[in-house]
């Protein structure tokens, strides 16, 4: 695995000090693996940077890629939502980012992601 992509649930688990997620982030750093965070997922999870030190640290650390929802990705997200008859822009953006990076998704809600992208490898926390 080249790295992992976080959805909002994975980020919230990190913020809540979930030991599995902390270990995964530490292992990724030790092995030089990339961590991808779609900006849409960050927007769902971030509420108070000063009170969310683990999350704030993750987005600043080397090896973390924060991916904006730009024009091409917005189009890919819209096409994916149309193809799957779903409406969650954030989950679709996570799927687009994870597929492009060839990464598994750290999530707490596998059902929603499986509806949008059944082919993705999911790490459920």
Placement of each model-derived feature along the sequence:
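Acidic catalytic patch
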Residues: 63-84
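Short, well-structured N-terminal submotif of metal-dependent ribonuclease cores
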Residues: 1-37, 46-64, 123
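Acidic, metal-associated active-site segment
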Residues: 45, 88-104
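Short loop/helix-cap segments at secondary-structure boundaries that form the rim of catalytic
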Residues: 111-119
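Generic enzyme active-site microenvironment
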Residues: 5, 106-107
